[in-house]
Amino acid sequence: MNFQPLGKRVLVERVEETKTTASGIIIPDNAKEKPLSGEVKAVGPEVEGVKTGDKVVFAKYGGTEINLDDKTYLVLNIDDVLGVIK
């Protein structure tokens, strides 16, 4: 993958959630909500406080989905990143 976000943007790969509940019920893909957390894969030159490899939580309706190397990523404005998971 070769993508460099511009300005105050970050490239995030969503973290896939489990496909079964604690009681063993399988959740079909069309019934799951998209995860609101992911791993930062690249950061723009104006981004502070977030670095590549950080796990972040982001706003539900933020960002733009893009496909790179057969994977789906999210390009987020840094204002849509709510926090870093430590």
Swiss-Prot record:
It is found in: Cytoplasm. Its main location: cytoplasm. GO terms for biological process: chaperone cofactor-dependent protein refolding. One of its GO terms (molecular function) is metal ion binding. Pfam families: Cpn10. InterPro entries: Chaperonin_GroES, Chaperonin_GroES_sf, GroES-like_sf. One of its GO terms (cellular component) is cytoplasm. It comes from the Bacteria. Keywords: Chaperone, Cytoplasm. Belongs to the GroES chaperonin family. Together with the chaperonin GroEL, plays an essential role in assisting protein folding. The GroEL-GroES system forms a nano-cage that allows encapsulation of the non-native substrate proteins and provides a physical environment optimized to promote and accelerate protein folding. GroES binds to the apical surface of the GroEL ring, thereby capping the opening of the GroEL channel. Heptamer of 7 subunits arranged in a ring. Interacts with the chaperonin GroEL. This is Co-chaperonin GroES. It comes from Campylobacter curvus (strain 525.92).
